[in-house]
């Protein structure tokens, strides 16, 4: 857990432009791993914040016409500052409006990581793809989708699902940790985007090991939380997840991590 240990020591400032539903949970989750979250949204202060920040999360869960230009502006400011961006195109396939905005953002700014479920990532590379809400289609070939998205956007791809797929540096890994309860908590996936951002440390071309550790730390914490005798369901799972992120140690991490490199 080299990266998590570094986070706990250095408390990296992680800027989150995220959706209204998940701000509190995202901030608390970042605090739990040792990062320092800032939910700054004003383009007017972005230049100053981005001089000292370590990464920026952009999550479009509550995209509106009123915040479109702000998102484009902060993404471009992040590029100018050399700040890596984690982009979470929430429900991009659910509407033409979302898909058009995501395409515009990805043309207007360079992101370091695109994170979403298989349906969301597919929607970014296939104009005919649609989706229902934020649910991933379990029948999709996530590895193939991730590889195509990586080739299209020349950026790291993280696809979440029952198994997670990471493609970066022309390498692909499948990770098999996690808990079904993550799908029963609003904002769990959005928090993962923030966690990934917390692991970047101003690396606009992130090391695949950082991405693997970020996703594995989050999902192993979810496993441990779900197995806790006090976990009775989604309501108790959420605070237990935060507690487990806070307490997660190297021994538990190494004992539980399940990862396979794939062609």
From Swiss-Prot:
Keyword Metal-binding attributed: yes
Keyword Nucleotide-binding carried by entry: yes
Binding site for substrate: 39, 187
Ligand binding (ATP): 115, 160
EC number: 2.7.1.50
Pathway the protein acts in: Cofactor biosynthesis; thiamine diphosphate biosynthesis; 4-methyl-5-(2-phosphoethyl)-thiazole from 5-(2-hydroxyethyl)-4-methylthiazole: step 1/1
InterPro entries named in the record: Hyethyz_kinase, Ribokinase-like
SUPFAM superfamilies: Ribokinase-like (SSF53613)
Names of the cofactor(s): Mg(2+)
MF terms (GO), sorted A to Z: ATP binding; hydroxyethylthiazole kinase activity; magnesium ion binding
Any single Pfam family the record assigns to this protein: HK
Family: Belongs to the Thz kinase family.
UniProt protein name: Hydroxyethylthiazole kinase
Organism: Staphylococcus aureus (strain NCTC 8325 / PS 47)
Organism classification: Bacteria, Bacillati, Bacillota, Bacilli, Bacillales
Encoding gene (name): thiM
């Amino acid at each position: 857990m080299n990266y998590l240990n570094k986070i706990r020591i250095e408390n990296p400032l992680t800027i989150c432009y995220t959706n209204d539903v998940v701000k509190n949970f995202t901030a608390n989750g970042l605090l739990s791993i040792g990062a320092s979250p800032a939910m700054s949204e004003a383009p007017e202060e972005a230049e100053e914040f981005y001089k000292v920040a370590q990464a920026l999360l952009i999550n479009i869960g509550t995209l509106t016409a009123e915040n479109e230009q702000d998102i484009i502006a902060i993404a471009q400011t992040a590029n100018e500052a050399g700040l890596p961006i984690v982009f979470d195109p929430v429900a991009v396939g659910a509407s033409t409006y979302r898909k058009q905005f995501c395409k515009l953002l990805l043309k207007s700014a360079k992101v370091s990581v695109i994170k979403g479920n298989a349906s969301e990532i597919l929607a970014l590379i296939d104009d005919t793809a649609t989706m229902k809400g934020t649910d991933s289609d379990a029948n999709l070939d996530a590895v193939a989708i991730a590889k195509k998205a990586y080739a299209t956007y020349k950026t790291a791809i993280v696809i979440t699902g029952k198994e997670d797929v990471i493609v970066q540096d022309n390498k692909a890994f499948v990770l098999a940790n996690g808990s079904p309860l993550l799908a029963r908590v609003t904002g769990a996936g959005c928090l993962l985007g923030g966690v990934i951002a917390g692991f970047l440390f101003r690396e606009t071309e992130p090391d695949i090991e950082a991405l693997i550790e970020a996703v594995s730390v989050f999902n192993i914490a979810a496993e441990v939380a779900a197995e806790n005798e006090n976990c009775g369901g989604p309501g108790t799972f959420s605070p237990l997840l935060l507690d487990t992120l806070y307490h997660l140690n190297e021994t538990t991490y190494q004992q539980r991590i399940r990862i396979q490199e794939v062609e």
